[in-house]
Regions:
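Bacterial N-terminal signal peptides
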Residues: 7-17
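Bacterial Sec-exported substrate-binding components of ABC uptake systems
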Residues: 18-57, 173-206, 336-368
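Short helix-initiation/N-cap motifs at beta->coil->alpha
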Residues: 33-35, 97-107, 239-247
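Alpha-helical, coiled-coil/dimerization segments enriched in small aliphatic residues
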Residues: 216-242
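Pocket-lining segment of extracytoplasmic ligand-binding domains
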Residues: 235-249, 255-279
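Extracytoplasmic ligand-binding site segments that recognize negatively charged/polar headgroups
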Residues: 74-82, 123-133, 148-161, 197-224, ...
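A short, structured surface patch at a secondary-structure boundary
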Residues: 55-113, 118, 122-126
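Structured C-terminal subdomain patch of bacterial secreted/periplasmic proteins
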Residues: 23, 153-167, 180, 268-368
Length: 368
């Protein structure tokens, strides 16, 4: 037997010994994030994304998520052009994917013309009148609609939502691996806080700080839940879960021990710039300017240097595990000194991400 033949036989043996990727059987009926039963007739090949941010979720379980798209909304491209640019560098075909809406509205005519076999909507879209109309329209034209939720109760729902996407898109192995990874890191935070029940600091989370007016504070929902998981206390917990406007007097009276600002790259809605593609020094400098106003500068949080910033759109993507770890490190450094979101991001990039995520997604006024 020649060496070439022996090598071929050995290669064939090794390939046969590898476990086959588990295949999903279609038609497939699933329960989506709104509790709706949805039947998907066949493996989706032409997907409509009601929110462009859900491309991030697809990119964690599929090596070429853009190849799945029949059409998508332009909200990620518009709100976070830097993260869009990263996808365009890796997958130039994204430039040719038709836009079907802006994340708030959906063009029914465009959706119908694209001959999609699945639509994925975000929970906040499906909860609106326009979203319900879109679901009804798409389903009447034969396009099944699956609703996903990375926003409401994200700490409890994100892993299950990834598993849902994995089943629907025939990527269960990859989705389950990410969900297990996510669950393990959230469990570490919960377990350690349970072992240290003493209360953490008081916190203000200020969405898109604006020197012209004050202030939109996160409540206990969305990213606000990431305060509570650390055992810390949100000064805006009496507001509706989504948060709301608060006055200077309210903040000064509460005098929070920690201040966290949220924003987007380029300071789209405020002067503070943080998120994909942002240099850490730019993020730190713009955060420093955001707390220069006299009333913020007088707060205990600012006086003590406990000022931090975070990419606001963590509330739309399964990367929110990074926000949870950043909050743990910032708010309870005494029990989370070994938790490092930078290392977690590196592992996500190495193990899961079709497009690596880079930039200053979180920042502290004081460099480590």
């Amino acid at each position: 037997m020649t060496m070439r033949l022996l090598s071929l036989l050995l290669a064939a043996f090794l390939l046969a010994a590898l476990p086959a990727r588990a295949e999903v059987a279609y038609p497939l009926t699933v329960t989506d994030s709104l509790g709706r039963e949805v039947t998907v007739p066949a493996e989706p090949k032409a997907v409509l994304l009601g929110s462009g941010f859900n491309l991030v979720a697809l990119s964690l379980i599929h090596p070429d998520p853009v190849s799945l798209l029949a059409g998508w909304a332009g909200d990620m491209k518009g709100d976070n052009p830097e993260i869009y640019a990263r996808f365009r560098e890796k997958f130039p075909a994204i430039e040719d994917v038709p836009i079907i809406g802006d994340g708030v509205t959906v063009s029914f005519e465009a959706a119908l013309s694209l001959k999609a076999d699945l639509a994925i909507l975000a929970n906040w879209q499906a909860d609106s009148d326009l979203g319900r109309q879109a679901i009804d329209y798409l389903e009447r034209t034969g396009v099944p609609v699956v609703v996903v939720d990375f926003n409401n109760d994200a700490l409890d729902n994100t892993a299950d939502t990834m598993r849902l996407l994995g089943r629907v898109l025939n990527r269960e192995e990859q989705a389950n691996a990410f969900a297990d990874f996510y669950d393990a890191r959230i469990a570490r935070i919960r377990e350690r806080v349970a072992a240290h029940p003493e209360p953490g600091p008081t916190v203000l989370m200020d969405a898109f700080p604006n020197p012209e007016k004050c202030c939109y504070a996160y409540g206990t929902g969305g990213l606000g839940a990431f305060i509570a998981i650390t055992g810390s206390r949100n000064i805006a917990e009496s507001l509706p879960p989504q948060g709301g406007l608060v006055s200077i007097e309210f903040i000064v009276a509460a005098n929070p021990e920690v201040y966290i600002a949220t924003a987007s790259p380029g300071g789209t809605y405020s002067g503070f710039s943080v998120g994909p593609g942002v240099d850490p020094e730019e993020a730190r400098e713009t955060l420093a300017r955001a707390v220069e106003s006299p009333f913020l500068a007088s707060l205990k949080a600012v006086q003590d240097g406990r000022v931090h910033g975070l990419w606001n759109f963590f509330n739309a993507v399964p990367l929110n595990v990074l926000a949870a770890e950043a909050f743990a490190r910032w708010l309870r450094p005494d029990i989370f000194s070994d938790v490092d979101p930078d290392e977690t991001l590196k592992e996500i990039n190495d193990r899961f991400a079709a497009v690596p995520f880079d930039g200053a997604y979180w920042i502290s006024l004081k460099a480590n």
